[in-house]
Amino acid sequence: MSQSAVSFQISPVSKTQDPLIQQKIDLKTKPPGALGQLESLALQIARVQATDSQQTDQPQNTVLKIVHPTMLVFAGDHGIAAEGVSIAPSEVTRQMVQNFAHGGAAINVFCRQVGFTLEVIDCGILTPVEGVEGIIDQRLGAGTGAIHLEPAMALETVDKGFAMARDLIERHHQAGCNLVAFGEMGIGNTSAAAAIMAAIMQLDVIDCVGRGTGINSETLERKLMLIELALLLHQSALTGPKSVLACLGGFEIVQMTGAMLAAAERKMLVVVDGFIATAAALVAVQIAPNVRDYLIFAHQSDEQGHQRMLEFLQAKPLLSLGLRLGEGTGAALALPLIQASVNFYNQMASFSDAGIEAVV
């Protein structure tokens, strides 16, 4: 049975109340703009939550909320990894998924610190982890095809992944969650992300490919060559964002893309992590441009090409820490800043409240 096409209906955020929202921000006890990027972030969050059909208050009375923040880490293996494009073999994907389940990875530590609930989704690692609680089975296969030799997956598999991702997001939405963050694990997935970037942005491969988690120059040359071969092989088939995912993507990238679209459809805030998650966001924006209104970009990673992709998406990340780990670590570290934006909007006194002469 073929998988029916999955579509998303995403409303743009309403900007009709921007003057009132901005006025509330400007009348806090500070010079205008003194909280920098936190102010533009508060405006974005207020727009999203004002767009929610359940929100009826005027901006001056609105209380912004972050409810049940959830980190979703999607894992999948890549056929191209067999060619040695990473510092680690594919087996490490499975080992790290086990590490996530046991609470021992960086993402576990950071989620515990900042208050994220963490879920790990097996989208298609080579060998499933059995007998370990805390891993959600949304497998689309046992690793993708090697993209320099064949498509990563069938087009129908992309839609199947989107449907699974929508169901996952719906479960969290029904539980009251209004902010989801996205991380990933998959040896070889920087190759897939770079190929997606090159295809969508029409760039030379050398402008998109980096050292991932730390490959040497010889491995980098091999990685460049294989991605160039992949783009040449699939050139005629790259007719739209879904075909880009089918030819060049990963099971985890597909489900991240679908989950971003589904979360925006439900008017949830979406926190995007690093290079691979941003590649998923790049595809999501091609599918439904309105999704961009809901995306918060956590950080600029140390991966070659990430800055260029962020600029293409007109995104200003919250952090720049030289991270190149993935897992959602940058997105986790951004949560306190997001909460700070919400808190100053809700709790900071206005000039009139404090009896201070306005400096607006």
Curated annotation (Swiss-Prot):
EC number: 2.4.2.21
Keyword tags: Cobalamin biosynthesis, Glycosyltransferase, Transferase
GO MF term list: nicotinate-nucleotide-dimethylbenzimidazole phosphoribosyltransferase activity
An annotated GO BP: cobalamin biosynthetic process
Catalytic residues (positions): 327 (proton acceptor)
Any single Pfam family the record assigns to this protein: DBI_PRT
Keyword Ligase: no
Annotated function: Catalyzes the synthesis of alpha-ribazole-5'-phosphate from nicotinate mononucleotide (NAMN) and 5,6-dimethylbenzimidazole (DMB).
Protein name: Nicotinate-nucleotide--dimethylbenzimidazole phosphoribosyltransferase
Organism this protein belongs to: Shewanella baltica (strain OS223)
